[in-house]
Amino acid sequence: MTQRTLGGTNRKQKRTSGFRARMRTHNGRKVIQARRSKGRHRLAV
């Protein structure tokens, strides 16, 4: 019997919290701007 590992999918992750998904909305752009000013190496997933 196989068990569900609840691993998640990369496509869903990119579509919801990827860079292009962030740039699509005003608040998403604010997220990118905040992470840039903080000096984050990774701006989005």
From Swiss-Prot:
Per UniProt, the ranges with Basic residues bias are 11-45
User: What does the entry list under GO cellular component?
Assistant: ribonucleoprotein complex; ribosome
Q: Name one Pfam family in it.
A: Ribosomal_L34
Region of interest (Disordered), ranges: 1-45
Q: Does the keyword Ligase apply?
A: no
Q: Which GO terms describe its molecular function?
A: structural constituent of ribosome
**Which domain of life does the UniProt lineage start with?**
Bacteria
Q: Name one GO biological process term.
A: translation
Could you tell me which Gene3D superfamilies the record lists for this protein?
1.10.287.3980
Question: Among its keywords, does the record have Lipid metabolism?
Answer: no
InterPro entries (UniProt xref): Ribosomal_bL34
Quote the biased-composition stretches of kind Polar residues, using this chain's numbering: 1-10
* Family membership: Belongs to the bacterial ribosomal protein bL34 family.
| NCBIfam families (alphabetical) | rpmH_bact
Protein name (database record) = Large ribosomal subunit protein bL34
Source taxonomy:
Bacteria, Bacillati, Cyanobacteriota, Cyanophyceae, Synechococcales
Gene that codes for this?
rpmH
